[in-house]
A protein has these predicted regions:
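N-terminal Rossmann-like NAD(P) cofactor-binding subdomain of oxidoreductases
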Residues: 1-190, 226, 290-291, 295-300, ...
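Charged docking surfaces used in two-component/phosphorelay signaling
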Residues: 67, 157-330
Length: 330
């Protein structure tokens, strides 16, 4: 099997390399692609030094079975035809094709069969916040249909890229030295702050990030589920957290929910409030699963349930999910 990584020098591209190394897929050849800035760099994979090739409109993808792409929506749109025209299946981490009717949007724990129906040979990876939420929601959906969801996200700096992480560290150092903090990657200072603004605002005053959770959840779950999201950037380096409230068709008890989560694929239950056992990004960064805790009945609605979930958005929220899609196809 011949695999390509497009955008290998980015945070998700580097995670692709690590995950492919860890999971020992039957890869005969791995080809790395990048921009002019990245071309010529070398990375080690399974003991070999691999040189990054410049991504160009040519026949470099001929003979490649799967391409894992994470180079931004603009690059994905520009190069999709180049990547797929010789039969390569493109598993794309960007937002470019997620809502296209003829492109499946896949989370393997939820809708793996959708990956097998990709007429354009493009499969889209959902947004990181959607991925971790639907993995958890699937456990409850299997018990009783979910009518609606309210979710507030607590998204780490790394969700905005490596430069954003560096800026957060710089801000803390500058403030500690009594200096004015550098603000470039975020709308405001993130250190000692939270910012209820991720991506641009739309006409309905929700951000694009929030509307992604609405549209993507419905597509992945093949459901009329209603989703209202508030997405917030928090001064955490890695791993996203979500506070989720949902309403089901019939009441679901806490014990039922715990049992469902404990059996769900891709979920780890951490739910012992009395023992201070609950998921936190400090301990979840670098892990593969969606961690669920703080499960409780809603006090205002008989059919309401609330929980808290945390997941590493670079692994399960991006690179790992794409590799799992690949694994469903081989």
């Amino acid at each position: 099997m011949k695999i390509a990584i497009v955008g290998v020098s980015g945070a998700v591209g580097q995670e692709f390399l690590r995950i492919l190394e860890e999971r020992r897929l039957p890869i005969d050849e791995l080809v790395l692609f990048g921009s002019e800035r990245s071309a010529g760099r070398t990375y080690k994979f399974r003991g070999k030094e691999l040189t990054v090739k410049l991504l160009q409109h040519n026949d470099d993808f001929k003979g490649i079975d799967f391409a894992l792409t994470s180079a931004g929506a603009g690059t994905s749109k520009e190069f999709a035809e180049t990547i797929t025209r010789h039969g390569t299946v493109m598993i794309d981490n960007s937002s470019a094709f997620r809502m296209d009717a003829d492109v499946p949007l896949v989370v393997p724990e939820v809708n793996p069969e959708d990956a097998k129906n990709a007429p354009r040979r493009i499969i889209a990876n959902p947004n990181c916040t959607t991925i971790q939420m639907v993995v958890a929601l699937k456990a409850i959906e299997d018990v009783s249909h979910i009518r609606r969801v309210h979710v507030s996200t607590y998204q780490s700096a790394s969700g905005a890229g490596a430069a954003a992480m560096a800026e957060l560290e710089t801000q803390y150092a500058e403030l500690g030295a009594g200096k004015e903090p550098t603000v470039a990657k975020f709308a405001f200072q993130l250190a000692y702050n939270v910012i209820p603004h991720i991506d641009v605002f739309t006409d309905n005053d929700y951000t694009k990030e929030e509307m992604k959770m609405f549209h993507e959840t419905r597509k992945i779950m093949h459901s009329d589920i209603a989703v209202s999201a508030t997405c917030v950037r928090v001064p955490v380096m890695r791993a996203h957290s979500e506070s989720v409230w949902l309403e089901t068709e019939r009441p679901v008890s806490v014990s039922e929910a715990r049992e469902a989560f404990s059996k769900a694929e891709g979920v780890v239950l951490m739910d012992d409030p009395a023992g201070k056992v609950y998921p936190m990004p400090l301990f979840i960064a670098g892990k593969d699963s969606v961690y669920v805790g703080r499960i409780r009945k809603d006090l205002t609605c008989d059919n309401g349930l609330a929980f808290w979930c945390v997941s590493d958005q670079i692994r399960k929220g991006a690179a790992l999910n794409a590799v799992q899609i690949l694994e469903t196809l081989i």
